[in-house]
A protein has these predicted regions:
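Acidic, Mg2+-coordinating active-site environments of NTP-dependent enzymes
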Residues: 3-4, 11, 16, 21-31, ...
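Nucleotide phosphate-binding/pyrophosphate-handling subdomain across enzymes
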Residues: 201-204, 214-225, 229-230, 295-441
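ATP-dependent carboxylate-amine ligase catalytic core
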Residues: 40, 60-72, 76, 80-98, ...
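Short, high-confidence coil segments that cap the C-terminus of an alpha-helix
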Residues: 199-200, 566-568
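C-terminal helical cap/extension that packs against the catalytic core
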Residues: 264-270, 274, 379, 387, ...
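N-terminal leader/targeting and accessory segments in enzymes
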Residues: 1-105, 109-110, 115-121
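Active-site-proximal loop/hinge segments that shape catalytic or ion-binding/gating pockets
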Residues: 576
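Active-site-adjacent alpha-helix immediately C-terminal to a catalytic or transition-state-stabilizing loop
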Residues: 581-593
Length: 593
């Protein structure tokens, strides 16, 4: 289908959804509207978030970084100037006893595991999730946590305006950049909060890359970590794993221990070279199985086989931090077999303590391999948005379905995919990876919670228009339909020589499809999509409204009947953490409190 025809379909869709005279101001993960003029600062939380949003959105910050790629080092110097204007010096950050973590996949989970382990030792923890890594699920204050809890709206508001006024008072009219962008402001604010709260340690997640990330003004972390590497943000970090590894290794510091998980040979060699250049002791984490040997198996609070590597890295980071701070009870060393094939020395193999075990078990990370059961509906939520993370998501979904109680062949079950992908990522490879899950329905919608006006500043987005997001959903549907056509001719189950980790190796056991076949639908917002999927069977969701908000599709009514009669409905929500956050907000309204 041509792009022009897609635009015409989007226009018809808008006409169907919004009657004449209705203003299409849309609520979403962030609201779609023209950027408002900054208002006089108030003292309410929503006022603070609106003003924060006016500084710049992530997308415009990334565009600025791309324009200035030849002058990257200047960005760190600029960040140091902002820090000084805020009333702090780089040396002040030393007292935060920082654990600095980068990586492409799993760095957020690694940080969550690490923070939970150390909190179990009675330590007061700070945790900062950089805006460059992933979007916040519901509220921006989730990014700054004390003892695992987001700072309260009152504390966020107080710290925001204090920092904002300091920066306003120190503006230089001759400078081309008078206020820090969204990324930088939140990073500065986190440092101020952690210092004022007198945390024992701060776990700081890198936003994008490492070498030139705004968090890399940290000069003396206690320990650094690098989670699994992959291809992402190529316009900023480079288009090869080696180039990306060079950027990630930029957080290494002289004499500061660093740990990484197994990586491909090329990127691992780059990390080793980066470490050697600045005399940073870099260690390779042994697998979790080595720490479990002779011990009860470790239970992880985050599901998915891929979380074991993140947990192994977190254990090493936590133990190293405790050791360097002269804490007792850090786990007895165990004998280990040295590997002659490693490019790096192996990190210690030790016996995890009860604090470590309970920390791993009790870790929670909403929106990542998360399962919610609501009567006959089970929601599988994972914000995977790269090929490698979607592969891991499919493995997790497959394992979860295999673990569920088996129902007889006469009991109908339905599988639904709810998907969206944003930015400049190509959705086709992601959708192809999801195909083997054998979904009965593929549902596409923008990252908009509902179609209505809102005053919720946490969900504002100034970077895209309604036409753009709906057109992208239609393109997702077209990709899915083409995959349907391809699957109709060759035998999907007899692909010779499946590539390790590729789609064929992720196939679920074949099952007979429902009589209605596979169908795809497009909705105008998350709320309408959830209403159609749940068909009134989830008491916390509204009864389905008229299907006029649907892009016209002949299976809308028959699909609703199938969903109402199914004994079990399994819904995988993936492709965008914004989408997952919007779904969670509707399924669990307490997250907005």
């Amino acid at each position: 289908m041509s792009r022009a025809r897609s635009h015409r379909r989007a226009g018809l869709f808008l006409a169907a959804v919004f009657p004449r005279g209705v203003t299409t101001r849309v609520t979403g993960r962030r609201e779609l509207s023209a950027r408002p003029a900054p208002q006089e600062p108030g003292m309410e939380y929503q006022d603070a978030v609106r003003t924060l949003n006016s500084l710049q959105t992530n997308a415009s910050y990334l565009a600025e970084v791309k324009r200035r790629r030849g002058d990257l080092q200047t960005q760190l110097e600029t960040m140091k100037l902002y820090l000084a204007r805020s009333g702090l010096q780089v040396e002040d950050l030393d007292q935060l006893n920082i654990i600095h973590v980068t990586g492409t996949k799993g760095k957020g989970s690694t940080c969550a595991f690490t923070e939970r382990i150390l909190r179990n030792y009675g330590l007061k923890t700070g945790f900062f999730r950089s805006p460059g890594s992933s979007p916040h699920l519901v509220q921006v204050r989730e990014r700054i946590r004390i003892n695992g809890q987001p700072i309260s709206p009152e504390h966020f508001t107080k710290h925001f305006w204090r920092l904002y006024h300091r920066l306003e008072e120190t503006k230089d009219s001759s400078s081309c950049v008078s206020m820090p962008a969204y990324f930088r402001f939140l990073t500065l604010m986190a440092f101020h909060v952690f210092l004022q709260e007198k945390v024992d340690l701060a776990v700081v997640e890198v936003g994008i890359g490492g070498a030139y990330d705004c968090t890399n003004i940290i000069r003396k972390p206690v320990v650094c970590g690098v989670s699994s590497l992959g291809i992402d943000h190529t316009s900023l970090l480079g288009d090869t794993m080696e180039k990306i590894a060079w950027q990630k290794g930029g957080i290494f510091k002289h004499g500061v221990p660093a740990f990484t998980v197994p990586q491909p040979d090329g990127p691992l060699a780059v990390l080793r070279e980066r470490a050697e250049q600045i005399s940073c002791p870099l260690y390779l984490c042994p697998p979790l199985e080595a720490l479990e040997e002779g011990e009860p198996p470790l239970t992880l609070g985050l599901e998915g086989e891929h979380q074991r590597a993140n947990a192994a890295l977190a254990l090493q980071l936590a133990r190293c931090w405790l050791q360097r701070k002269d804490h007792q009870g850090i786990g007895e060393l165990k004998a280990s077999r040295p590997s002659l094939l490693c490019q790096l020395p192996l990190a210690p193999v030790f016996q995890p303590t009860s604090h470590m075990r309970h920390g791993l078990r009790d870790t929670e990370w909403p929106g990542r391999t998360q399962t919610l059961r609501r009567g006959p509906l089970t929601w599988y939520l994972d914000g995977a948005h790269t090929s490698s993370s979607v592969q891991a998501c499919v493995r997790w979904f497959r394992q979860a379905l295999h673990r569920r109680p088996k129902s007889g062949p006469e009991v109908p079950e339905v599988r639904v995919l709810l998907f969206n992908s944003t930015g400049d990522r190509d959705p086709a490879p992601l959708l192809k990876l999801l195909r083997p899950c054998q979904f009965d329905y593929a549902v596409f919608c923008p990252n908009l919670t509902e179609v209505s006006s809102t005053d919720n500043a946490d969900q504002q987005n100034f970077m895209v228009t309604l036409d753009q997001v709906l057109l992208r959903c239609l393109e997702h549907q077209q990709h899915w339909s083409r995959l349907d056509e391809e699957a109709a001719s060759p035998d999907l189950w007899s692909t010779p020589g499946p590539e390790a980790g590729g789609p064929a190796s992720l196939l679920l056991a074949p099952r007979l499809p429902h009589a209605h076949g596979t169908s795809s639908l497009v909705f105008s917002c998350i709320s309408h999509a959830l209403q159609w999927i749940s068909q009134g069977r989830d008491p916390d969701l509204q009864t389905p409204s008229s299907p006029r908000d649907l892009l016209a599709h002949p299976v809308a009514s028959s699909g609703a009947s199938v969903l109402r009669e199914a004994a079990a409905v399994h819904v995988l929500v993936t492709g965008s953490l914004h989408l997952v956050g919007g779904v969670l907000k509707l399924l669990d309204p307490s997250l907005s409190q």
